């Protein structure tokens, strides 16, 4: 006989007796009957971010929310956050109305809502003043968001801990995040120590954010067990992308080691470089013996059809088909699948420039596959030299851009690190937080040569508060600050996009871009004459002699 202490995570599968007893003597046979309960979250926001540029409109979100509820398997839904509000503004839509409309149905039935929060950068790609970050939590709580998933791409706790405090003050649940990657530095013990610090600072949950899907399953299992051993009451939520193909193994590993909640997606946006589908995850865990909720398949098919309708309506024109494909090549470079679309667009311009240079030198042109492999190899070269920053927004973009520019300047005979902007240098110099590893000597020497200074100053102390200036701008323009100051918040968080939105130009620009995308898609299927006839259906098409 062996003595076990019963943790609340095991649920009540062997009766009320286990519930009321703190410690009992039981056999291994009884232990095997106890099923760990696993809950699921639908990352509806991230499904779209990892697939394309835009998010569904308010009316579309309001239509799908009741269907998600009817599926009966989701304890949580990711409703908003980074890459949600900004793209709403770019489409000429009000993100505050969208967040309220999407959160409300879930709030009414007790499904928790959560948002993505970039810590120091909040909802954008560059640092945000303290007073604007504080306001964000008050606004999001008022709009119906329960949980904020706070991350720093560098895992610098200085960028996360203030947000934990402000989120708690606003009544939100702060979920602190570990950005997962695979490097000699990023061990289970390294991450566990960060989790200890974040939990001591007030984090109520921990998210393992495997944004590129390159976290090794064994490491993720070991890390989960370490955190649960040290903090048995802390909820652990796993978020893993499916791009490189490790995600299902990782889900099984973290669940077998104590994880509580798994992020999932639904068709037609699951898999590829997005997330595993709820059906597959539920089936695997159910057959492994976990206590998981059943899926209402009629509602699943309805949600699937609605999501496809949104794609066909307009969102699909901004989705890169390559994001539907998995790729083991991602394991080497570590880039997240969600940025592959923008990366391929950037690569196209460099590809043409490099091939022109090669032709001038009498060398054979490269295929796009050749260029892609060269870029992945260059990212592998650059990444350790810039200190192994986890490749998540914005550091994935910075690292990729350094590698991309290197390919061009190497071809030009100028060497590496010639075309680096202030944002790239800011990461290297420590202005965004502490880099996990060592910066390469050649970059340190280049910084000295360019009179750039490294810093270890707490990043958020470098910014002055800014709300008073934005309040004045709202007043001067005759703009209302909005319910719970939500319009003031949008201006302060996304000043450039909000001003264009208020001018009406955002909607005009978006509609022009949409028409251009539709024309481009039609143009691949129709002749010039057919395209003209389609666009002017009631007119007689004329063809020049």
Report residues per predicted region.
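Short, positively charged and aromatic/hydrophobic N-terminal segments
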Residues: 4-5, 9, 13-30
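Hydrophobic faces of well-ordered beta-strands that scaffold small-molecule active sites
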Residues: 39-44, 75-79, 111-118, 148-149, ...
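Glycine-rich phosphate-binding active-site loops on the catalytic face of alpha/beta enzymes
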Residues: 210, 257-274
């Amino acid at each position: 006989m062996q003595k076990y202490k019963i943790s609340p995570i095991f649920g009540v599968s062997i009766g009320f007796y286990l519930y009321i007893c703190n410690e009992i003597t039981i056999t291994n046979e009884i232990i095997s009957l106890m099923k760990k309960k696993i809950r699921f979250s639908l990352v509806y926001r991230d499904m779209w971010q990892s697939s394309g540029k835009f998010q569904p409109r308010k009316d579309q979100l309001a239509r799908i929310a009741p269907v998600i509820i009817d599926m009966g398997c989701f304890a949580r839904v990711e409703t908003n956050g980074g890459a949600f509000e900004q793209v709403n503004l770019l489409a000429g839509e009000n993100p505050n109305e969208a967040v309220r409309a999407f959160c409300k149905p879930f709030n009414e039935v007790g499904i928790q809502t959560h948002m993505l929060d970039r810590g120091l950068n909040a909802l954008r790609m560059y640092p945000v003043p303290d007073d604007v970050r504080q306001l964000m939590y008050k606004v999001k709580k008022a709009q119906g968001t329960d949980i904020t998933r706070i991350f720093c791409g560098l895992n610098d706790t200085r960028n996360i801990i203030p947000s934990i405090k402000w989120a708690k003050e606003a009544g939100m649940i702060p979920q602190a995040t570990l950005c997962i990657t695979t490097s000699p530095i990023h061990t289970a013990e390294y991450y566990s120590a960060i989790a200890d610090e974040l939990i001591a600072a007030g984090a109520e949950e921990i998210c393992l954010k495997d944004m590129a899907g390159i976290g090794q399953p064994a490491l993720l299992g070991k890390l989960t067990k370490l955190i649960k051993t040290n903090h048995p009451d802390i909820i652990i939520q796993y978020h893993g992308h499916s791009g490189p193909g490790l995600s299902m193994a990782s889900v099984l590993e973290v669940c077998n080691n104590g994880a509580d909640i798994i992020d999932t997606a639904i068709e037609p946006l699951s898999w590829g470089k997005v997330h595993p589908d709820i059906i597959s995850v539920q089936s695997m865990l159910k057959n492994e013996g976990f206590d998981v909720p059943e899926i209402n398949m009629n509602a699943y098919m309805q949600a699937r059809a609605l999501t496809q309708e949104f794609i066909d309506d307009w969102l699909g024109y901004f989705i890169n088909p390559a994001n539907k494909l998995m790729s083991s090549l991602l394991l080497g470079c570590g880039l997240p699948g969600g940025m592959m679309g923008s990366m391929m667009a950037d690569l196209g311009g460099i590809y043409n420039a490099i091939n022109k240079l090669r032709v001038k030198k009498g060398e054979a042109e490269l295929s796009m596959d050749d260029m892609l492999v060269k870029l992945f190899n260059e990212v592998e070269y650059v990444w350790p030299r810039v200190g192994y920053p986890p490749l998540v927004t914005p550091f994935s973009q910075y690292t990729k851009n350094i590698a991309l520019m290197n390919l061009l300047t190497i071809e030009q005979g100028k060497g590496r690190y010639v075309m680096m902007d202030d944002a790239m240098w800011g990461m290297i110099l420590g202005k965004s937080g502490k880099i996990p590893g060592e910066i390469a000597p050649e970059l340190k020497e280049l910084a000295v040569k360019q009179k750039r200074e490294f810093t270890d100053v707490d990043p958020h102390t470098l910014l002055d508060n800014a709300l008073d200036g934005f309040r004045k701008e709202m007043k001067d323009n005759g703009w209302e600050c909005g319910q719970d100051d939500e319009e003031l918040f949008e201006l302060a968080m996304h000043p450039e996009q909000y001003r264009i939105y208020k001018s009406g130009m955002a909607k005009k620009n978006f509609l022009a871009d949409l028409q251009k995308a539709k024309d481009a898609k039609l143009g691949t299927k129709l002749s010039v004459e057919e395209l003209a006839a389609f666009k002017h259906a009631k007119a007689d098409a004329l063809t020049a002699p």
